[in-house]
Design a protein with these regions (language model features):
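A detector for short, charged/polar N-terminal pre-domain segments
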Residues: 1-12
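Short basic helix-loop element that most often maps to the first helix and adjoining turn
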Residues: 15-36
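Conserved hydrophobic/aromatic packing and binding residues within compact polymer-binding modules
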Residues: 17, 31-32, 47-50, 76
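Helix-turn-helix DNA-binding elements, focusing on the entry/boundary residues of the two helices
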Residues: 17, 28, 44, 59-62
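Recognition helix of helix-turn-helix/homeodomain-like DNA-binding domains
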Residues: 37-56
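DNA major-groove recognition helix of helix-turn-helix/homeodomain DNA-binding modules
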Residues: 54, 58-75
Length: 78
């Protein structure tokens, strides 16, 4: 059976988080700050690791990221 998490690709949304963040001309720090305003604490370094797919994303983080980036959760998975 194939492993879902192999140490390299630890999430499925990283490339789209980067895509939508850049479309909104938002820095990683601004995304981090916006998440914090929602009570979700993801430092700038963690945003970088999410985008590089080297960090997992919790369900709460997923909902908050989608809200801040103004996209549906489904769009993050495309």
């Amino acid at each position: 059976m194939a492993r879902i998490i192999d140490g390299k690709d630890m999430n499925l949304i990283g490339k789209n988080v980067r895509k939508y963040r850049k479309l909104r001309k938002m820095s990683q720090q601004k995304l981090s700050d916006s998440l914090e305003l929602l009570g979700v604490y993801v430092c700038r370094g963690s945003v970088s690791r999410i985008e590089d797919k080297s960090r997992t994303v919790t369900d709460i983080e997923l909902f908050a990221i989608a809200k801040v980036l103004e996209v549906s959760i489904e769009e993050l998975f495309k």
